[in-house]
Swiss-Prot record:
Assembly and oligomerization: Forms homodimer. Interacts with G6PD1.
Active site: H345 (proton acceptor)
Binding site for D-glucose 6-phosphate: K253, H283, Y284, L285, G286, K287, E321, D340, K441, R446, Q482
Family: Belongs to the glucose-6-phosphate dehydrogenase family.
This protein's pathway: Carbohydrate degradation; pentose phosphate pathway; D-ribulose 5-phosphate from D-glucose 6-phosphate (oxidative stage): step 1/3
Binding site for NADP(+) 1: G116, A117, S118, G119, D120, L121, A122, K123, R150, K253
Cysteine disulfide links: C168-C176
Catalytic activity: D-glucose 6-phosphate + NADP(+) = 6-phospho-D-glucono-1,5-lactone + NADPH + H(+)
Name of the coding gene: G6PD2
Protein name per UniProt: Glucose-6-phosphate 1-dehydrogenase 2, chloroplastic
Binding site for NADP(+) 2: K438, R451, R480, Y488, L489, K490, R573
Organism annotation: Arabidopsis thaliana (Mouse-ear cress)
Alphabetized InterPro entries for the sequence: G6P_DH (IPR001282), G6P_DH_AS (IPR019796), G6P_DH_C (IPR022675), G6P_DH_NAD-bd (IPR022674), NAD(P)-bd_dom_sf (IPR036291)
Main location: plastid
Amino acid sequence: MAALSSSVTTRSYHSGYLASFSPVNGDRHRSLSFLSASPQGLNPLDLCVRFQRKSGRASVFMQDGAIVTNSNSSESKTSLKGLKDEVLSALSQEAAKVGVESDGQSQSTVSITVVGASGDLAKKKIFPALFALYYEGCLPEHFTIFGYSRSKMTDVELRNMVSKTLTCRIDKRANCGEKMEEFLKRCFYHSGQYDSQEHFTELDKKLKEHEAGRISNRLFYLSIPPNIFVDAVKCASTSASSVNGWTRVIVEKPFGRDSETSAALTKSLKQYLEEDQIFRIDHYLGKELVENLSVLRFSNLIFEPLWSRQYIRNVQFIFSEDFGTEGRGGYFDNYGIIRDIMQNHLLQILALFAMETPVSLDAEDIRNEKVKVLRSMRPIRVEDVVIGQYKSHTKGGVTYPAYTDDKTVPKGSLTPTFAAAALFIDNARWDGVPFLMKAGKALHTRSAEIRVQFRHVPGNLYNRNTGSDLDQATNELVIRVQPDEAIYLKINNKVPGLGMRLDRSNLNLLYSARYSKEIPDAYERLLLDAIEGERRLFIRSDELDAAWSLFTPLLKEIEEKKRIPEYYPYGSRGPVGAHYLAAKHKVQWGDVSIDQ
């Protein structure tokens, strides 16, 4: 008999139920729909009837998975009518038992456990994001947050630690301090080892105390090193998972180092979790402008017809940080910039950009189209990749360290802190269009942007008649993900006057100027999606496999041949080789032009 998963949604119910009764045909399951009367109106209530052929018995399950009634179908000449009567009787008894909830409040609770609560990610991102969701009223009415890590700490000490990183998005917002106090009262702590069944069992007992008999939905956020993912998942799954609600686990990158280790990690996780319980987080997919990418394309007629090789000459995905590893070199040296940024953040954005129109906005439909893009990509040639590493540089009397000056980095390390690559998609829409990626640390600025450079105007009338620069007859769409989120389109126009001189101007949508509301942090969106079961912005296992299949051969060749990176000064625009790579494909990096 197939297992029946409990629904995410639960509702309070009253004693007057039947407004409609509609069986749905099926061998083993039939869905029954009722309307439950409440002071707020009529609410739909879905039940599932499960028939057991061998015994002839039928069980009716509530939305929360609880059995309402068991009956023998042979005992009733009209089994559906008999079941209906039994269900109504059982629901009336249940309503009397639970008590009428005239306010319609949910009888479920969400328990969020941050595993690795004493780490930087938890302190700087996860707890502040959870507080922001609470402040905006986005968390369920009944929720509890537990920090879990090896550090010895009390509830009060956790709250003191967390309180230092909490802020309201806009200063002096009403009731900010009061909201913080309310939020911190919902935060608790349990110390334990990540591989201890006993410690997770103790956590389970504490969670149950706070859940107070409600349907328990549990979310575990693994903010821990990848080498202990599986141990923590095993313990959480076997000793602290929900017995009557859902259990979900958010896994932070890196998801392995290559195809082999990624597949092994996925296989190990699936020993204890189903695929739909695993939420692989890439926080860049939660950024506002990345989310707006699909809206921009699919809801504006002026863009969608141009979204192909016929009009687009190249696409650039640019990521830069103006700081180095600075103490995190030990972690970074094991992965490098290609694994850290390109294989996940930039490749995920590329897949969203290049995908075909999905059937719907459903998570599976979108992820299906992204996988098709990744599987259509041409293997990356090592000749189409430039790697670099920042070196020491003195500017304004200040000396900035080289990557290998970091005490946590092995001397003589060849790990790249910069990479540029040209990628191609072998399908009808994008054949021949170079997709350029560039990512680096210790560069001249901090930014992340998508640049779409359109083809030259055919015939270039103004170049022929006035001698204007050829590039003045092209357009560029820029989506600035960070900082100062914006979308702008570069167009050509005539400079006022008697002559015929062209100028480039921007049609600019600067978010801070257009919208008074501050943009939510990416972690807020992703945490809320995980709580609500929305998987659109999380990475499916076949997406991950396709991404690693693309980059693993390149990484092996670079590392096995010990390719020496091109050195560039701290605070510069990166190695010169990146410009030669772009020129090779008849492209100029958009972020180096005068007007940018």
